[in-house]
Design a protein with these regions (language model features):
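Short, compact, well-ordered microdomains
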Residues: 106-128
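Short, surface-exposed beta-strand/loop "edge" segments at domain boundaries and coil↔beta transitions
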Residues: 66-80, 128
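A short, flexible low-complexity segment enriched in Lys/Arg and Gly/Pro that occurs
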Residues: 95-110
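Long, contiguous N-terminal structural blocks used for assembly/anchoring
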Residues: 1-68
Length: 129
């Protein structure tokens, strides 16, 4: 038998865990530069649930994000954020998941990655880029 190179594909079901601090980290990264190319402002809906705006989502609140070039606006909720995170991971966005604990490692989430998570959350796809 020859030494031939073959490739095999396996299908995986992946579960990732995300803690409040992880959501806060991703939201902070997004709001401080990740989404600023297309989003001019973010405002909490109702009562502010944390000390900072980026803490709103993980605590069950929502943020209204305002388009940089039009009057369009979108509401980001925890459910949308989690859906966006899942879509981003499924689409190959570079998010590291610890094999033992299942928690995501936010130290790898830069502005571009955070931006993609938020765009998947709001639009279900990557628009604006």
């Amino acid at each position: 038998m020859k030494n031939e190179s073959r490739e095999f594909e396996v299908e995986l079901e992946l579960k990732a865990r995300v803690a409040t601090r992880d959501i806060d980290d991703i939201m902070c990264t997004a709001l401080e530069g990740g989404i600023t190319g297309w989003c001019r402002a973010a405002k909490p809906v109702g009562k502010r649930l944390g000390e900072y705006g980026h803490e709103q989502i993980a605590r069950g609140g929502s943020l209204v994000l305002y388009d940089a070039e039009s009057s369009d606006k979108w509401e980001l909720t925890l459910n949308k954020f989690l859906r966006g995170l899942a879509l981003a991971i499924e689409s190959g966005v570079s998010v590291t998941i610890d094999a033992e604990s299942g928690y995501i490692d936010t130290s790898d989430v830069d502005g571009e990655c955070a931006d993609m998570i938020i765009r998947y959350a709001l639009f279900g796809e990557l628009i604006f880029g």
